[in-house]
């Protein structure tokens, strides 16, 4: 293992001892904020240090086995121990490197999910509704809560655009690689000749800002309009101006919210989505810069990139970034995304490990 990594691990081991001591200090336990911070740090450090101590023990066992190689009576046993120990050491080194990878500070956060119909007219809107159902079912599987913030439906029950807040620990870490272009190939319900059509939708996954204060929203930069909320086909569902449209003048970002009968609640939701979008723009700019430097496809933040194709006649889904094809489209559309999300996370980790090895 690289000396710089060993130095870092030794420092983390010392820090764990220090944190353990502080958690037993009555003065610290009286300060709940400090106690919570230290408890979280202790939980983060413990698995790293445990693996490090296991690595050190394996290194010591290997040294003992090497000493026995000169003993004719023990040579065969020593060689077997060396072989096993070296395999164990390689596994421990890989696990330690993964544990040392930089943590995404947004991983534990709730998210705002946006699905927009692209090319394909009504069929694209129907596919947007299918995608939204897919993510909603995935959220249910993880016992997360889904709250629709804003939805624009067409007459066939599809979504021109739908924005939802998904509340659940680690939601961003599991869904952050879903942003991008999603393409569908199938025979639309409106097609009478049985021809396969290709349509597309765009998905955006944004971490919820901790607080609105985390993103500076200068009131002078905002234009807030109110209007009557309307349902599919333009029918009014509310006779008061409860719907809210917020425009962020410096960026041109526009957020509409009309799902609640309360103008106050709609405004609060719209501002929360706006804060997430502004934060997302800043984050994607950083990601694209980093991705250009390391020629990464995963987590590049490029929303124009076509990331996945759903082919209904063949029952397959293909993620183009990692060349993964699954012939279980029905299960995927029902929210069984674990195989996809796990593979994308593993690929991202591999990219980070390669970067770590090159540093």
Swiss-Prot record:
Domain of life, per lineage: Bacteria
Keyword hit for Protein biosynthesis: yes
Originating organism: Laribacter hongkongensis (strain HLHK9)
Protein name: Peptide chain release factor 1
PROSITE patterns reported for this sequence: RF_PROK_I
Principal location: cytoplasm
Entry's Gene Ontology molecular function annotations: translation release factor activity, codon specific
Post-translational modification note: Methylated by PrmC. Methylation increases the termination efficiency of RF1.
Gene3D superfamilies: 3.30.160.20, 3.30.70.1660, 6.10.140.1950
Alphabetic keyword roster: Cytoplasm, Methylation, Protein biosynthesis
An annotated GO cellular component: cytoplasm
Function, as annotated: Peptide chain release factor 1 directs the termination of translation in response to the peptide chain termination codons UAG and UAA.
Any Pfam family matching the protein: RF-1
Annotated family: Belongs to the prokaryotic/mitochondrial release factor family.
N5-methylglutamine found at: 235
InterPro entries noted in UniProt: PCRF, Pep_chain_release_fac_I, Pep_chain_release_fac_I_sf, Prokaryotic/Mito_RF, RF-1
Gene that encodes it: prfA
Localization, UniProt: Cytoplasm
């Amino acid at each position: 293992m690289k000396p710089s990594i060993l130095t870092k691990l030794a420092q983390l081991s010392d820090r764990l001892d220090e944190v353990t001591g502080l958690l037993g200090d009555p003065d610290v336990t009286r300060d709940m904020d400090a106690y919570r911070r230290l408890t979280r740090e202790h939980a983060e450090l413990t698995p790293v240090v445990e693996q490090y101590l296991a690595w050190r023990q394996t290194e010591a066992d290997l040294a003992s086995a090497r000493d026995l190689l000169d003993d004719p009576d023990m040579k065969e046993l020593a060689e077997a121990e060396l072989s096993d120990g070296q395999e164990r050491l390689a596994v421990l080194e890989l696990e330690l490197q993964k544990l040392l990878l930089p943590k995404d500070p947004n991983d534990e956060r709730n998210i705002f999910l946006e699905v927009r119909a692209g090319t394909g007219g009504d069929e694209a809107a129907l596919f947007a509704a299918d995608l939204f159902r897919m993510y909603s079912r995935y959220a249910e599987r993880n016992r997360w809560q889904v709250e629709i913030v804003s939805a624009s439906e067409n007459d066939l029950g599809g979504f021109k655009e739908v924005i939802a807040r998904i509340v659940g620990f680690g939601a961003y870490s599991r869904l952050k690689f879903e942003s991008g272009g999603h393409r569908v190939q199938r025979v639309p319900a409106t097609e009478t000749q049985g021809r396969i059509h290709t349509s597309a939708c765009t998905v955006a996954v944004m971490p919820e800002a901790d607080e609105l204060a985390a993103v500076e929203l200068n009131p002078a930069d905002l234009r807030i309009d109110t209007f009557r909320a309307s349902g599919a086909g333009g029918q009014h569902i509310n006779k008061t101006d409860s719907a809210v449209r917020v425009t962020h003048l410096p960026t041109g970002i526009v957020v509409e919210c009309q799902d609640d009968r309360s103008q106050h609640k709609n405004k609060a939701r719209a501002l929360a989505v706006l804060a997430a979008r502004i934060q997302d723009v800043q984050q994607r700019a950083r990601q694209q810069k980093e991705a250009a430097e390391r020629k990464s496809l995963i987590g590049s933040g490029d929303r124009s990139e076509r990331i996945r194709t759903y082919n209904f006649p063949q029952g397959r889904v293909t993620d183009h970034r990692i060349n993964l094809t699954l012939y279980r489209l029905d299960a995927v559309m029902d929210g069984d995304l674990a195989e996809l999300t796990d593979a994308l996370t593993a690929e991202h980790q591999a990219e980070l490990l390669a970067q770590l090895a090159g540093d």
